């Protein structure tokens, strides 16, 4: 019996206990990215599950969302727009501040990066608590775009990140923990 894509990818993901702090089990996706055949399968799997949304542009969240986002944008023949942490983008920016478990953070996008009501697919490597992805959705809206869906390589389902994302918008993940 052939292994599913999720099973194949799970076999490559490295579990790192107590990183970045004690009690955390870090799911390291870099072995998947290092394997060209596996990474190609990730992009093909994401394209198949998300193409029906008919996105016009992909927004990737700093930092690993840049890797996923640019790869998927090339696969789908779309443009890519980076959403960055503070102070990394030149020129006028639009920003959103958001709360974290341990404080707050900020995401920024260049003004004019999205055209009015452009259909945006938000991507990142991992969906955990959903706070950053929800903040990115707010930022996309402020910048004039409309989130049509979310794509993640992996999802930590026990953390309930999907519940923080706007209802009625497709959320796809290839690997579920």
Curated annotation (Swiss-Prot):
It is found in: Cytoplasm. It holds the Pfam family Pribosyltran. It catalyses: AMP + diphosphate = 5-phospho-alpha-D-ribose 1-diphosphate + adenine. Its main location: cytoplasm. Its EC number is 2.4.2.7. Keywords: Cytoplasm, Glycosyltransferase, Purine salvage, Transferase. Pathway: Purine metabolism; AMP biosynthesis via salvage pathway; AMP from adenine: step 1/1. One of its GO terms (biological process) is purine ribonucleoside salvage. One of its GO terms (cellular component) is cytoplasm. The keyword Transferase applies. GO terms for molecular function: adenine binding; adenine phosphoribosyltransferase activity; AMP binding. The keyword Cytoplasm applies. InterPro entries: Ade_phspho_trans (IPR005764), PRibTrfase_dom (IPR000836), PRTase-like (IPR029057), UPRTase/APRTase (IPR050054). Gene3D superfamilies: 3.40.50.2020. Catalyzes a salvage reaction resulting in the formation of AMP, that is energically less costly than de novo synthesis. Belongs to the purine/pyrimidine phosphoribosyltransferase family. Homodimer. This is Adenine phosphoribosyltransferase. It comes from Synechococcus sp. (strain RCC307).
């Amino acid at each position: 019996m052939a292994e599913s894509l999720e099973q194949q990818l799970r076999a490559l993901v490295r579990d790192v206990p107590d990183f970045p702090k004690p009690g955390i089990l870090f799911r390291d996706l870099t072995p998947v990215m290092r394997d060209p055949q596996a990474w190609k399968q990730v992009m093909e799997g994401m394209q198949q599950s998300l193409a029906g949304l008919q996105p016009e542009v992909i927004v990737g969240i700093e930092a690993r969302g840049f890797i996923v986002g640019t790869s998927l944008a090339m696969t789908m023949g779309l443009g890519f727009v980076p959403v960055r942490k503070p102070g990394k983008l030149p020129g006028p920016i639009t920003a959103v501040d958001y709360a974290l478990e341990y404080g707050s953070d900020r995401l920024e996008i260049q003004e004019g990066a999205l055209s009015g009501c452009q259909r945006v697919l938000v991507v990142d490597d991992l969906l955990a608590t959903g706070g950053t992805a929800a903040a990115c959705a707010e930022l996309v809206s402020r910048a004039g775009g409309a989130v049509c869906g979310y794509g993640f390589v992996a999802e930590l389902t026990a953390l309930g990140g999907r519940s923080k994302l706007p209802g009625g918008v497709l959320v796809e993940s290839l690997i579920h923990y």
